[in-house]
Amino acid sequence: MLFKSFVTFTVLANALAAPLAHQHHQHKEEKRAVHVVTTTNVVVVTIGNGDQTTTFAAPSVAAESSVSVSVNTEPPQNHPTTTQDVASASTYPSSTDGSAASSSAAASSSSQAGSEPSGGVGSGGAKGITYSPYSDNGGCKSESQIASEIAQLSGFDVIRLYGVDCSQVEAVLKAKTSSQKIFAGIFDVSSITSGIESLAEAVKSCGSWDDIYTVSIGNELVNAGSATPSQIKAYVEEGRKALKAAGYTGPVVSVDTFIAVINNPDLCDYSDYMAVNAHAFFDGHVVAENSGAWVLQQIQRVWTACGGKKNVLITETGWPSRGDSNGVAVPSKSNQQAAISSIKSSCGASAILFTAFNDLWKADGPYNAEKYWGIYSN
């Protein structure tokens, strides 16, 4: 597992994690709120990576845990997590060698098994940031507007895109710095092969496969109740085959929420590393300044659910600047800044922030906050 900071957590030994609620962000052709729950128990785990180790209290998924997915239009009921019981994180050096989280663990997906591409953290303070090519009215931003906005994101090593429409891949390839890479996405799983053909054409005309950090097939499909784990397997296999034919040999993943992976550990077998979305705001029991500890805990929970075989990258995490409160989670610009600072400090090297700019084309969404997650928007 890749961490920017190595952290010790203490959790009450007899604590029992209550069910979690998670909602996902709207993207094109997606308008549903989802409630997924699981039951976990707390165990203490020590993992290592090279010459550093991490000790944490990681919830382990109970053997009898079952999936509960319901699609509805109401915000899910919120329940506290064990994050409230987690002590303040502190970084520390260590010379102890360990291998429990080594990316050399075998997996069935590909030669990239378990591994996330190497790379550090730029001046942006996190691995990357998500970007949307849609204007306020839902149309496509111009190439010049995309270039101007991407220039503001030069401090991030990775720019995450969700699809191939609006010529977004071409525009971002032209606008990004030579050292930046794109986390590309095939959003429409009904046309995976054609989506990859569009991606390949964009890469051929404006860059090379070296510019692509990872390719994701689908986003939060299990969490949304739109696909089963076995369907995700088929989607990823189709995507991997088409990508290989197009000359791409890098990592292929399917992004879902942390709770969907915990509830469906079969998902661990299909992606080359675990790419999961996790937002403390939707928990409702985490204040903004504790977001980093909460996100790090979800990284640890996913890592545990996957048997320590796969590195974990958070592919969405952030905080809204406007909207209605969700328990103790209060949207505001100052709270957004506090949350982002906390995430960068605790796990920035393992996190892609959500999102660069406000998405005013979206519906108001849960807590009337869906439009207002833009970190660089006023």
From Swiss-Prot:
GO BP: any one term: carbohydrate metabolic process
Record note on modification: Glycosylated protein with a polysaccharide moiety composed exclusively of mannose and glucose at a ratio of 12.7 to 1. Contributes highly to the carbohydrate component of the matrix. Treatment with tunicamycin impairs glycosylation.
Catalytic site positions: E316
Induction profile: Expressed predominantly by the mycelial cells. Also induced during cell wall regeneration and biofilm formation. Repressed by fluconazole.
Record text on subunit structure and interactions: Component of a multiprotein complex of 250 kDa composed of at least HYR1, MP65, and PRA1.
Family: Belongs to the glycosyl hydrolase 17 family.
Protein name: Cell surface mannoprotein MP65
